[in-house]
Amino acid sequence: MANKEYPLAKFRNIGIMAHIDAGKTTATERILFYTGKTHKIGETHEGGATMDWMEQEQERGITITSAATTCFWKDHQVNIIDTPGHVDFTVEVERSLRVLDGAVTILDAKSGVEPQTETVWRQADNYKVPRMVFINKMDKLGADFLMSVGTLRERLHANAVPLQLPIGAEDSFSGIIDLVKNDAVIYKDDLGTVMDETEIPEDMKEIAEEYRTMLLEAVAEVDEDIMMKYLEGEEISVEEIKTALRHGVIANKIVPVLCGSAYKNKGVQLLLDAIVEFMPSPLDIEDVKGTEPTTGEEMTRPADAKAPLAALAFKIATDPFIGKLAFTRIYSGTMKSGTYVFNSNKGKRERIGRLVKMHANHREEVDELKAGELGAIVGLKDTTTGDTLCDDANPIILENMEFPEPVIDVSIEPKTKAGQEKMGIALAKLAEEDPTFRTYTNQETGQTIIAGMGELHLEIIVDRLIREFKVECNVGQPQVAYKETVRKHVKAEGKFVRQSGGRGQYGHCWIEMMPTEGEYEFDNAIVGGAIPKEYIPAIDNGIQEASQSGIIAGYPVINFKVKLVDGSYHDVDSSEMAFKIAGSMAFKNAMSKADAVLLEPSMKVEVVVPEEYMGDVIGDINSRRGRIEGMTPRAGAEVIRAFVPLSEMFGYATTLRSKTQGRGNYVMQFDHYEEVPKSIQDKVIGERK
């Protein structure tokens, strides 16, 4: 089966994404079971799920890295990426979405849309990924299908169109109404393989009729022929509905909603049918866009195995047996093992050792990967996440991925002197795999610092150091990644002159510095050759290097723009080095006049608490300098939304547990940087000295 060639139209590259614990990995496990990839179903709470292949994942029961796997259903090849739902690992989601053609979002039927669902949805909007929704855990206490559909419309502004309705809920969830075919499926056994297709039960005919009308209206909106038939009261066939739905989904105009219980094996085969019927193939999406490396001219590549090669390395992983694996999506052309490809981002040729298709962590070697396929490459030396691999006669650079900056850091040291080098190598490998993880040395203290997206993120990094790389280490207290910025528009000079026998040094520039929205902008406004062109990049470099350490407390400076307005040079003594130093001097002089302030990460926090504890929890958030944004009731609990400075959130989980007797839970994610109050700023400066 696996060796059969499938035409591109029968490919589906999809991601499965959700909030933590919505049942995403369980759903993927069931898909693999039904498509014949696994013979025994793995359970995440038993620590045996096939897709969760790192030891930490099996222990914690959560998915950290996005495993990629290929399976087959109804004569289609489905490539699935299971992405993590925990906010600290959004980088994995971002990477996966960049290379997928469609996504299935899984919701928990008792909670509907949750904070991480919103984050993932926004990321998918960014890449215009067509989506469908599977409302899972219909068998659980408090399951509410229509409430969940409502949250899709209210919180995500999605045009959510149910294609199914559940028959019963909680313990009595026994089947699914198919609104497209206008019939019902009743489940007879626990494996979900024995099911009866029957008529819609009497007591549900009215609601089914109402929702089928809504479905027809939704497809009529995207298909004029159906609109005419609908208005004239003509019968619309199942095939016509399916075709229109497919077009609506691919155009991002309709989000179909299905339901089921992956754990109880209900609704999974219908979900697979819907993936095949409504999700796009590589041929249905726009040709991939990129730029010509030398001219910067925009170009596109078609999804065609005969076209020149264009592929994107979207993830680097280290495999204990074969070393570095580069997970890659082939957009056009064909990649063959043993051949050379051109890495257009690095400007280097790379040799492809072997090509493998992945099934979670089992590998199947192949001779080639064609347009539309996902696979992993063994043997690349210089390729990192986001690099384009192409044909050196037809170079192209595909749009890269943008990753958020880390917001939390901790100091780390090996327990033994001998472990220092080993730790350095291990940290470099981990940083190569994960663009949101950074490691650097604090120049003042000489300590090694690791920085990431949250406490869990860094915990798992430390865990991997111990397990995979056998490095025992001590970890300091988490520190907030503060930044600095400027509030005034100022002009400043930087002049570096040195005469000490032999050739001197001369660099001189005038800059204007001002606040801006972006991280950093450099604008060369020199006219009349006051500074020769070849020295301009050196000034820019000098400013960027100096901005890594601000004047308030030595934190990186962001949200500022520099305009280079004037300067002078010396025919003999001027050099790149002299202008680089002049640039950094001008930056420091400008900072001292520009009313610099300290910024701190502000986190978007969502706390779910039983009503009786609400007063206590809100009081506690206020005492942490939090700003309450709103509250929403949800099935016997309240959802409190607030912005709270990260520095006030350390150890919050313990406080919340004691204030709610273990019944409250929360999620938080980085939202923006904001100014630190004067009293806190003085405290931070005091601690840095």
Swiss-Prot record:
One of its GO terms (cellular component) is cytoplasm. It is found in: Cytoplasm. One of its GO terms (biological process) is ribosome disassembly. Residues 9-283 form the tr-type G domain. It comes from the Bacteria. One of its GO terms (molecular function) is GTP binding. The keyword Hydrolase does not apply. Keywords: Cytoplasm, Elongation factor, GTP-binding, Nucleotide-binding, Protein biosynthesis. SUPFAM superfamilies: EF-G C-terminal domain-like, P-loop containing nucleoside triphosphate hydrolases, Ribosomal protein S5 domain 2-like, Translation proteins. Transmembrane segments: none annotated. SMART domains: EFG_C, EFG_IV. GTP binds at residues 18-25, 82-86, 136-139. InterPro entries: EF-G-like_DII, EFG_II, EFG_III, EFG_III/V, EFG_IV, EFG_V, EFG_V-like, G_TR_CS. Coiled coil: none annotated. NCBIfam families: EF-G (TIGR00484), PRK12740.1-3 (NF009379), PRK12740.1-5 (NF009381), small_GTP (TIGR00231). Catalyzes the GTP-dependent ribosomal translocation step during translation elongation. During this step, the ribosome changes from the pre-translocational (PRE) to the post-translocational (POST) state as the newly formed A-site-bound peptidyl-tRNA and P-site-bound deacylated tRNA move to the P and E sites, respectively. Catalyzes the coordinated movement of the two tRNA molecules, the mRNA and conformational changes in the ribosome. Belongs to the TRAFAC class translation factor GTPase superfamily. Classic translation factor GTPase family. EF-G/EF-2 subfamily. HAMAP family: EF_G_EF_2_B (MF_00054_B). PANTHER family: RIBOSOME-RELEASING FACTOR 2, MITOCHONDRIAL, TRANSLATION ELONGATION FACTOR G-RELATED. This is Elongation factor G. The gene is fusA.
